[in-house]
Amino acid sequence: MSFFALGVNHQTASVELREQIAFNAERLSNLLAEQRHHESLKDLVVVSTCNRTEVYAMAEDAESLLKWLADANNIDVKQLIHHVYRYENAQAITHLMRVASGLDSLMLGEPQILGQVKSALALSKEAQTVSPELNSVFEYAFYAAKRVRSETAVGSHAVSMGYAVAQLALQVFSKPEKLTVMVVAAGEMNSLVAKHLAEMGVAKMIICNRSRERADQLAQEIAHQVEVEIIDFSDLAENLYRADVVSSCTGSLHQVIAYADVKTALKKRRYQQMLMVDLAVPRDIDPKVESLDGVYLYGVDDLQSVIDENLAQRRQAAVEAEVMVNQLATQLITHQKVKEAGSTIHAYRQHSEEISQRELTQALEALHHGGNPEQVLQQFAHRLTQKLIHPTSMLLREAAKAESPDYFEWLQQHLQDVFDHERKPKR
């Protein structure tokens, strides 16, 4: 059995193909529950996100994983064959560590992928398709990801608008748990802003949107993390004073937050500072607002320059992170080899003990039947020696015939080291 990683991601497959082989939790749970009864492939974890679908498994070959992935999604293997990547053992371990650390993500260093991989492992555990060996590989990958995030700067710089706004709020306000945030428009960009700020632990989220349906949808997505209030778009100006952070991204052709509205809001707030972020083009917020004392106004260009600089810093940090991942992968592989060697040594000892017991039984029987003790002991020693050295002798002969002289020389040298050690006088 080998450890394999096989799949597709944003670099190897179109979104149309990724959609075809994506799994939701319920369907995947049912498939895994069925799979645990198949001896040929019953030890696997499937990671499925919008940017990747990957199968990690202990298996005889990668082809069985490819066939399973195709069959599970009712598509021909030929549709996948030119888009999948596959890694085995050391390369598969390194790949899993890179994925969990965010080094293989579309957004370099993104933190969400680690949680997604952990959820994938948990789902497979529920379906009983995770052996102790497979589990240990994943747990070590999580350890590697934690080391990468804590010891390098690969995830410490905002590289998305939503995350950048959240980080900006932390810089302006030191205690997020006391903040009230207003998102003006509940589209894709502000949804990310709302989710990042909700995860950060803000006190309240006010959603101001023209469409009540979209506002309700966003509210449902974050309600488990933060108190949510929805207001009509027509009530925007009179509620501005309640927000410590305002993020606006309406797509309107005209400004929706006027200078006078912000000035009035500041007065109602007794001039407590406000962070206002304008993610819209054309702009939603009157740029003259920046002149008001207590208002921090940031636009798309301001944030983009920060993101570009941060992305460069992440890329630089990623070089250090890659070195760390390779070192940790090597450590795990070495540990696995030592463990495997321990099992082999135990089996070898047991085999030698069985030979010794058989020869000893034969010698005792000879003595019992009146055999000459000296001859019996000599025969016992000779037969035991022959049987114990026979496998090593055969190994040396085969190594000498092989086309790899390095292996034969290595074997000779190690045997010589053993001889030299045995010849040393015992103290």
Swiss-Prot record:
Additional detail: During catalysis, the active site Cys acts as a nucleophile attacking the alpha-carbonyl group of tRNA-bound glutamate with the formation of a thioester intermediate between enzyme and glutamate, and the concomitant release of tRNA(Glu). The thioester intermediate is finally reduced by direct hydride transfer from NADPH, to form the product GSA.
Query: From its record, what is one biological process in GO terms?
Result: protoporphyrinogen IX biosynthetic process from glutamate
On subunit structure and binding partners, the annotation says: Homodimer.
**Similarity section:** Belongs to the glutamyl-tRNA reductase family.
List residues binding substrate: T49, C50, N51, R52, S105, E110, P111, Q112, Q116
> Which principal EC class is assigned to this enzyme?
oxidoreductase
* Name under which the protein is recorded: Glutamyl-tRNA reductase
Pathway field: Porphyrin-containing compound metabolism; protoporphyrin-IX biosynthesis; 5-aminolevulinate from L-glutamyl-tRNA(Glu): step 1/2
Q: Where is this site: Important for activity?
A: H95
EC numbers: 1.2.1.70
Reported function: Catalyzes the NADPH-dependent reduction of glutamyl-tRNA(Glu) to glutamate 1-semialdehyde (GSA).
| Gene Ontology terms, MF aspect | glutamyl-tRNA reductase activity; NADP binding
User: What is catalyzed by this enzyme?
Assistant: (S)-4-amino-5-oxopentanoate + tRNA(Glu) + NADP(+) = L-glutamyl-tRNA(Glu) + NADPH + H(+)
**Which PROSITE patterns does the UniProt entry name for this protein?**
GLUTR
Residues annotated as binding NADP(+): A185, A186, G187, E188, M189, N190
Name the UniProt key words of this record, in alphabetical order. Answer: NADP, Oxidoreductase, Porphyrin biosynthesis
Q: Which SUPFAM superfamilies match?
A: Glutamyl tRNA-reductase catalytic, N-terminal domain, Glutamyl tRNA-reductase dimerization domain, NAD(P)-binding Rossmann-fold domains
